[in-house]
Amino acid sequence: MALPILLDCDPGHDDAIAIVLALASPELDVKAITSSAGNQTPEKTLRNVLRMLTLLNRTDIPVAGGAVKPLMRELIIADNVHGESGLDGPALPEPTFAPQNCTAVELMAKTLRESAEPVTIVSTGPQTNVALLLNSHPELHSKIARIVIMGGAMGLGNWTPAAEFNIYVDPEAAEIVFQSGIPVVMAGLDVTHKAQIHIEDTERFRAIGNPVSTIVAELLDFFLEYHKDEKWGFVGAPLHDPCTIAWLLKPELFTTVERWVGVETQGKYTQGMTVVDYYYLTGNKPNATVMVDVDRQGFVDLLADRLKFYA
């Protein structure tokens, strides 16, 4: 039986590819998609969800827009990474359908309430919508199987020296998620920076030759440009968000550890840092499954295999 999931995202090139991977996978039943502000403004990320679902001919999936800003902060966006539209590069279709007449939290709550079994929430942007759901609907916590997030790092940040972008945008929301008591799976930079797509991988996707694989290759062409900066030391572009979906499909591709994670919300230099108690120094019980390594080739092969679904 397919695993029911709710996808909360802020497309974003890697979010878009996570959507492509999820909807090409019969093991997953995507119940709804909600958008968060992050990689671009809330209006643009919502539009990008609708554009991707129009491309994939999945306008049957309910969509709703989420919070327009973080819980306690002003919004920061990553337009230097994702471009003016949030999905610069390919020519994507205009949306042929409209979002639901409700908020992201309302759609999430309705989906959980109506599900016969607990639902996995996959969150690949800032955690604002998920935190609002947890705070406003404690009665629905038991309907959440787990929360799989792309965010954080055990070491180096990618937005500040200490913080990864998604967590930095709304650290208060991320702290609510980690301390919720619901199982959390964290795909942080430790693993996503190893999930790099090289130029030859992009050409492999392009050669599959269907409209979706071509769009994915064009998304990667644009995404690679930012990551060519030699400061990163990358060979390709790290495909952060699809690691969440890939872990659900093939957990054997990933090495994980069980650890306690907290989020720094106050620090002078470390706001947005995920503090991972790797050596069990706090005495706190682990609250997260933390991905630390990935079989890169297996990850690329999975993407290539699933892109053939769209032939």
Curated annotation (Swiss-Prot):
Provide GO CC annotations from the record.
Answer: cytosol
Q: What highest taxon heads this organism's lineage?
A: Bacteria
Q: Which residues form the active site?
A: H240
Task: Please give the InterPro entries that the UniProt record associates with this protein.
Answer: I/U_nuclsd_hydro_CS, Inosine/uridine_hydrolase_dom, IUNH, Pyrim_hydro_RihA, Ribo_hydro-like
Q: List the disulfide bonds.
A: none
EC number(s) given by UniProt: 3.2.-.-
Recorded hits in Pfam families, A to Z, give: IU_nuc_hydro
Give the UniProt keywords, A-Z: Glycosidase, Hydrolase
Q: Which GO terms describe its biological process?
A: nucleobase-containing small molecule interconversion; purine nucleoside catabolic process; pyrimidine nucleobase metabolic process
- Molecular functions (GO terms): purine nucleosidase activity; uridine nucleosidase activity
* Protein family membership: Belongs to the IUNH family. RihA subfamily.
Function comment: Hydrolyzes cytidine or uridine to ribose and cytosine or uracil, respectively.
Q: What is this protein called?
A: Pyrimidine-specific ribonucleoside hydrolase RihA
- Species this chain originates from: Shigella boydii serotype 18 (strain CDC 3083-94 / BS512)
